[in-house]
């Protein structure tokens, strides 16, 4: 069996180190930096010939820089005769550009990125909670899309929730919310119907379901500006919700996210470590982070040993 080696770019160094610790190994020796003009510079400083290589790199902000780091690292490892290269992308950027609505003159950038990664020599992709699962079909190589829900669920069960109800912040998240509700002792579910007048601006319309006197658990795949969740929480509290907890896998926290969350009525925001948090977000008392390092380490181990990934999520 080829030697398994982990490498990491500059996007998620803490998560990469946690994964390495879980696997009782160390990160590979690679210098990933910049030339004086800003171009990505990569130097692999150890033998990887024939190795089973995993590159841990989210394509979060700065998205283009982190994507280019990943691509250039793949090329460097491929030219160094790596046996198999798996791109471990905890957060897959550009995933929201996955279709042309009403044949609008826009790109399907998720497909462009998938082609880019395939063309430079990625043999396999491991990612977490793709914004749209069908993005897996954009790739010409195997994609393992694992879920953060078991980690989130474990935390929910420790919250001492009183008469909980799982809430989807929009119609598109119903499937995710239903799955969480089923695992959370088959609890009830509510849906927030909203309309989005323009990008990153959400207007809550009304709530489908009875939330009065209950602990509400909002679940989503990501938090961007936080506008959706904060307005959803306001609507829930107006309808008599007792407490509101917001759970999401990917903490993008762009734009006015810090102010939105600081001034919101959300009791606690719980996210995963697929994207590093800024100092401003870390300073917020109602934001807490869970690590996916154990789950990703197990997925990497299974891929390296040719074991089933889907078996991790069988209940």
Swiss-Prot record:
Cofactors demanded by this protein: Mg(2+)
Keyword terms, alphabetized: ATP-binding, Cytoplasm, Kinase, Magnesium, Metal-binding, Nucleotide biosynthesis, Nucleotide-binding, Transferase
Gene3D superfamilies, per database record: 3.40.50.2020
A single GO cellular-component term on record: ribose phosphate diphosphokinase complex
Ligand binding (Mg(2+) 1): 131
UniProt-annotated binding residues for D-ribose 5-phosphate: 196, 220, 224-228
Ligand binding (ATP): 37-39, 96-97
Catalytic reaction list: D-ribose 5-phosphate + ATP = 5-phospho-alpha-D-ribose 1-diphosphate + AMP + H(+)
GO biological process, one term: ribonucleoside monophosphate biosynthetic process
Name of the protein described by the UniProt record: Ribose-phosphate pyrophosphokinase
């Amino acid at each position: 069996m080829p030697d398994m080696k982990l490498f990491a770019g500059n996007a998620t160094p803490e998560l990469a180190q946690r994964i390495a610790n879980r696997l009782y190994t160390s990160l590979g020796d690679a210098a990933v930096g910049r030339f004086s003009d800003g171009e990505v510079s990569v130097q692999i400083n150890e033998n990887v010939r024939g190795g089973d290589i995993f590159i841990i790199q989210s394509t979060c902000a700065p998205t283009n820089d982190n994507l280019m780091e990943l691509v250039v690292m793949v090329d460097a490892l491929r030219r160094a005769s790596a046996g198999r290269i798996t791109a471990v992308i905890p957060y897959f950027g550009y995933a929201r550009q996955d279709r042309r609505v009403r044949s609008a003159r826009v790109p399907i950038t998720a497909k462009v990125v998938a082609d880019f990664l395939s063309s430079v020599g990625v043999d396999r992709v491991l990612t977490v909670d793709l914004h749209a699962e069908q993005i897996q079909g954009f790739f010409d190589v195997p994609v393992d899309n694992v879920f953060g829900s078991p980690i989130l669920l474990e935390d929910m069960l420790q919250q001492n929730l009183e008469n909980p109800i799982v809430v989807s912040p929009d119609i598109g998240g119903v499937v995710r919310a239903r799955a969480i509700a089923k695992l959370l002792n088959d609890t009830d579910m509510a849906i927030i119907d909203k309309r989005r007048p323009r990008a990153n601006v959400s207007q809550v319309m009304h709530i489908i379901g009875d939330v009065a006197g209950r602990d509400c658990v909002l679940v989503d795949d990501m938090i961007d500006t936080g506008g959706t969740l904060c307005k959803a929480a306001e609507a829930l509290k107006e309808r008599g919700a007792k407490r509101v907890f917001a759970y999401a896998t990917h903490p993008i926290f762009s734009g006015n996210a810090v102010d939105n969350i600081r001034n919101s009525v959300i009791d606690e925001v719980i996210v995963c470590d697929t994207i590093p948090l800024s100092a401003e977000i870390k300073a917020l008392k109602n934001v807490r982070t869970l690590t996916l390092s154990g789950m990703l380490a197990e997925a990497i181990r299974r891929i390296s040993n040719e074991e089933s990934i889907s078996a991790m999520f069988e209940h």
